[in-house]
Curated annotation (Swiss-Prot):
Domain DRBM: 114-191
Protein name: Ribonuclease 3-like protein 1
Entry keyword RNA-binding: yes
GO molecular function: RNA binding
Gene, per the UniProt record: RTL1
Pfam families cross-referenced by the UniProt entry: DND1_DSRM
Keyword field: RNA-binding
Bias (Basic and acidic residues): 85-110
Record-linked InterPro entries: dsRBD_dom, RLC_Component
Region Disordered, annotated ranges: 85-115
Keyword ATP-binding tagged: no
Family annotation (PANTHER family): LOQUACIOUS, ISOFORM B
Transmembrane segments: none
Amino acid sequence: MEDQETKRITKKPSRSIIISLKDIPPLDPSSIPSMKPMAQDHHNVGMQRFQEKTDFKFEEEDNAISSFSNIQIDPNSTRSISLEKKLAPKPDEEHTTTTKPISKDDESKTRRGSAKSVLHEMCASKRWRPPVYECCNVDGPCHLRLFTYKVMVEIRDSSGKTVLECFGDPRRKKKAAAEHAAEGALWYLEHVKTKPHQ
C-alpha cells in the first residue's frame, strides 16, 4: 500500500531551484521609487482662513520676492538685498527643466510597494500557494545578530510543480532579510521564468 502511494508522488515531475542573490546583478537605481515627499497644496491655508475672518487683505507678492523667501543669506555678506532679488531664479524655469513626462512603466514601479507584498499578489493572481518565509540562519553575537531568510514559492504550471527557494543576504533585521529574499524571488520570476527555455 505504501509503495503505491510513493509511486503516485513520484509520477509528478518535481524540480527544486535554489538561487542566491550573490549571482543576481544589482538593481538598476532608476527602478527604485524616489523618497521625495508629496507636494504640499496647503501652504496658504492659514492665510486664507485669516482673510476670511477679517477684512484685511494682503497684496500678492511677485515671483522674485516669493522665491527670495527661500534663499538663505549669509549675515557676513556685503552684497545688497536688491542684488539677491535679481539673482533669484524664476520658479517656472526650474520646473520646466527638471520635470519630464512620466511613462506608465515608471508609474507602475513607483506604486508597487514592498517586494513581499508584490510577491504575495503575484502568487495570488497565478493561483499558487502563498510564499513561505523561513529564517534559515542566525549568525553573530546576541547584540549583533545577522538573520538570513529564505522564501519558498511553489510554482504550478503545465510542466508540473517547481519549488523555488531564494536566499537573501544576512541582515540586522528580520523584516529586511525577508524583504531581500522576496526581491530575489521576484527577480527570478520576472527575468528568468518569463523567458522561454532556449
